[in-house]
Curated annotation (Swiss-Prot):
Name listed for the protein in its UniProt record: Shikimate kinase
HAMAP family: Shikimate_kinase (MF_00109)
Signal peptide start and end residues: none
Gene3D superfamilies (UniProt xref): P-loop containing nucleotide triphosphate hydrolases (3.40.50.300)
Positions annotated to bind Mg(2+): S15
Location of the protein in the cell: Cytoplasm
Disulfide-linked positions: none
Gene Ontology BP terms: amino acid biosynthetic process; aromatic amino acid family biosynthetic process; chorismate biosynthetic process
């Protein structure tokens, strides 16, 4: 079966849903952020601080390309990875892209107090602008799943119903 790529803003549940979905499908789960941390030997926030966002975005692109030729993967992308048109095109060519659409207020609630997310250092207005900009690219996904008011298990079951 083709790969499944989960896209969405930070805090949308990509990693949580991805692990559960991979388990249900018998697929391997890949978290791009974790793969980057493993390769760099540093936390994402430290990569951002030391080398900047554009360096990190290049790492994301290289990392996703590593998995494009594989099969039977559920891939949790970083929030910015799926917000790049070129990355979106490549993922769609290689698999099914699923957007976990989560309202911004829910994202704020889930992420408050999380100092591991460098983009939360921005003010609310900047985050809202980034959120709106990224939504336009996330909307190119093959499948949109609203996560509002749903448990990770409900989201996984909805995905399974849509991909089978």
């Amino acid at each position: 079966m083709r790969n499944i790529y989960l896209v969405g803003f930070m805090g949308s549940g990509k990693s949580t849903v991805g692990k559960l979905l991979a388990e249900k499908l018998g697929f391997r789960f890949v978290d791009i952020d974790q793969e980057i941390e493993k390769e760099e030997g540093k936390k994402i926030k430290d990569i951002f601080r030391e080398k900047g966002e554009s360096y990190f975005r290049d790492l994301e692109k290289r990392m996703i390309e590593r998995f494009l030729g594989s099969k039977n993967l559920v891939v949790s992308t970083g929030g910015g990875l799926g917000a790049d048109s070129e990355n979106m095109r490549k993922m769609k060519e290689n698999g099914t892209v699923i957007w976990l659409d989560t309202p911004l207020e829910t994202v704020f609630e889930r992420c408050k107090g999380d100092d591991e997310r460098p983009l939360l250092k921005k003010n609310r207005k900047e985050i809202k602008e980034l959120f709106e900009k990224r939504k336009k690219i996330y909307a190119q996904a093959d499948i949109r799943i609203s996560t509002e008011g749903k448990s990770p298990y409900q989201i996984v079951n909805e995905i399974l119903g849509r991909i089978r």
